[in-house]
Amino acid sequence: MIENIEQGTLPPGCKACIALTSWKKRINTVGLTIFNLMCVCGPEFHIVLTLAEEEFPRKERELPRDLVLMNKAGVFEILWVKKNWRSFKKWVFCGMRYSKYPIITADDDCIYTYNYAKELCYHLPRKKSQKTCVTYWCDRYAHTNYFNTSGYATCYSPNYFGNITNYLKPEMLYEYHEDDMWYVALRYIKHIPGCICLNKSYNDIVVPHNEIEPLHDLYKGRTRAERDKMISEFITLLEQ
C-alpha cells in the first residue's frame, strides 16, 4: 500500500465524517464549501479535506489563507496523502482513517442548501454490521442493480468496503478516471447490495459556486449501455 493512514477517533459529539477533496484549480474556492458545511451540518459532522503532497509539495504553505486559518481553528481536518489519487482520494483515505464511522461525501464546488448529511445518516440501518450506502438520485437515474453509481452525495456505513488495498491500482484508476465507477466495481466484486436512493434532484440539495469543469464526467455523452460496458471492463481488470 502506497499510503500509510493512521486510524483516527472522531472528536466528542461527532457521529460521522464529511469527506471531500480538491485540486489546484479549485483550491482557492473550496473554503467556501467547507465553511458552508460547517454552518449547515453543524458540529455533529467532522469535515475531512484530503489533499495530495504530490500536487501541493509545500503543503499548508501553498494553501489559501482562509483554509489554513479554518484548519488551525479546528473547523476541519486536512488529511495529507503522498500520491495524487485525483477524485479517488475523496472517500478512500478518510474511510481508512475513520473506518468505524459513517462517511458522507461532498463536492468541492457546491453550496449545500440544508443538512443533507443528517438526512443521509438517518436512512442508515441501525445494525452497524449491515453494509449500506444511501445516496440521492432523481427518478430517471434510480436503479437497484449493482451498476447503480453513487448520486450527488452519498453516505457509506462504517467499514463499507472492508480491506481495499488490493484494488488501489493507480494506473488503472487513472485510465478509468471516475471514482464512482470504482465504487460500483467494488460493490460488485464484494457482493455488496446497491445503494438506497432518495428521490431528489441535484438542485434540491446544492447550488454550484465554481464554474471549473471536473476532469472527467462518466455520464457526459454516454448512454446507460455504454456506461455499463465501461464498468464491466473495469470489474474484469480489478479481478485480475
What are these regions (language model features)?
Residues M1-K24, N28-T33, N163, P170-Q240:
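C-terminal catalytic/acceptor-binding lobe
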Residues G13-C17, M38-L49, G74-E77, Y101:
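Short loop->beta transition adjacent to catalytic acidic/histidine clusters or analogous donor-positioning motifs
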Residues L20-S22, L51-E53, T135:
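Short beta-strand/turn micro-motifs composed of small residues
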Residues W23-I27, E54-F56, D109-Y112:
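Short acidic, S/G/P-rich loop/turn micro-motifs used as interaction or catalytic elements
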Residues L32-F45, E53, L69:
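Short, acidic, metal-binding catalytic loop of nucleotide-sugar glycosyltransferases
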Residues T50-F56, D139-Y141, S201-Y202:
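Short beta-alpha junction loops
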Residues T50-Y101:
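Active-site-proximal specificity loops/subdomain of glycosyltransferases
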Residues C94-G95, A106, C110-M172, Y176:
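Conserved catalytic core of nucleotide-sugar-dependent glycosyltransferases
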